[in-house]
Every structure is written in structure tokens, then in C-alpha cells.
Swiss-Prot record:
Sequence positions that bind heme b: H64, H93
One GO term describing the cellular component: hemoglobin complex
GO terms classed as biological process: hydrogen peroxide catabolic process
Lineage of the species this protein comes from: Eukaryota, Metazoa, Chordata, Craniata, Vertebrata
Stated name of the protein: Hemoglobin subunit beta
Ranges of residues in domain Globin: 3-147
Length: 147
């Protein structure tokens, strides 16, 4: 269980209030698939992922990126019990999809990079530290079923 200060909760809530899901989600997932091409194996049904332009222009990648980013809303709503909030998704990713849990870290790094680029100077070191703590809690919860 993660302990959150009032300031951390306020910071996470503020970040989510400014998220442009339709922009950040597709960019983050595209970046992950381009920078870490082995992650593409989980998206074989998405069609053409042969190069960066194809990935960036792929509607299924964009749609799933938005879905993933909205998946973080669950953690925002249940910050005091993130592990339980993601129990079903952890089971899905480990038992049905067989996703290597190390990929959660790769995607979270890409989300952070895209968010930092979007927010610019507003994404201070303190803001990043809090956001990384949040993503770390989500990644841990998603990986729980693997332990």
C-alpha cells in the first residue's frame, strides 16, 4: 500500500485535470512501440507496425493508447487502494495476454516523456517525482498477479 501526502494527491489530481488523453495516449504508446520494438509482439492484430510512420498513423495504436491512459484514471480514483483497483487488469495481463511485466515500466517511461514534453516547465522535478511514484504504484499493482 502506498502512502500519499495531501500534496501528492493534489499534484496527481492536477496532472490528470490537464491530460489531453487523445494526444498523450497515442503518442506514448507509439513511442513505446517505436523505441522498444519487441513490445510490438502484443499488438499483432493492429495491422501495419513496420516503421515509425506506420505506427504513428495506426488508428488501432491511437485508440489503445487512449484506452491505456484512461486506465490510469482507475488509479486516480482509488489512490488509497491501487493494488485492489488493478487486480482484474493484473490477472488479464498475466493470465490471458501474457504481457511481460517489464513492459509496464517501458510504457510508463514513455507516458512520462510525452507528458513532460506537453507540460513543459510546469512538469517540475517535484511533479515528476510524484507522477513517477503514482506510475510505480500502478505498475506494481499490474504486476501483482505475476508474483
Amino acid at each position: 500500500m502506498v502512502n500519499w501526502t495531501k500534496t501528492e494527491k493534489a499534484t496527481i489530481t492536477d496532472i490528470f485535470s490537464h491530460l489531453d488523453y487523445d494526444d498523450i495516449g497515442p503518442k506514448a504508446l507509439s513511442r513505446c512501440l517505436i523505441v522498444y520494438p519487441w513490445t510490438q509482439r502484443y499488438f499483432s492484430g493492429f495491422g501495419n507496425l513496420y516503421n515509425a510512420a506506420a505506427i504513428i498513423g495506426n488508428a488501432k495504436v491511437a485508440e489503445h493508447g487512449i484506452k491505456v491512459l484512461h486506465g490510469l484514471d482507475l488509479g486516480l480514483k482509488k489512490m488509497d487502494n491501487i493494488e485492489a483497483a488493478y487486480a482484474d487488469l493484473s490477472s488479464l495481463h498475466s493470465e490471458k495476454l501474457h504481457v511481460d511485466p517489464d513492459n509496464f515500466k517501458l510504457l510508463s517511461d514513455c507516458i512520462t516523456i510525452v507528458l513532460a514534453a506537453k507540460l513543459g516547465s510546469a512538469f517540475t522535478a517535484e511533479t515528476q517525482a510524484t507522477f513517477q511514484k503514482f506510475l510505480g504504484a500502478v505498475m506494481s499493482a499490474l504486476g501483482k498477479q505475476y508474483h
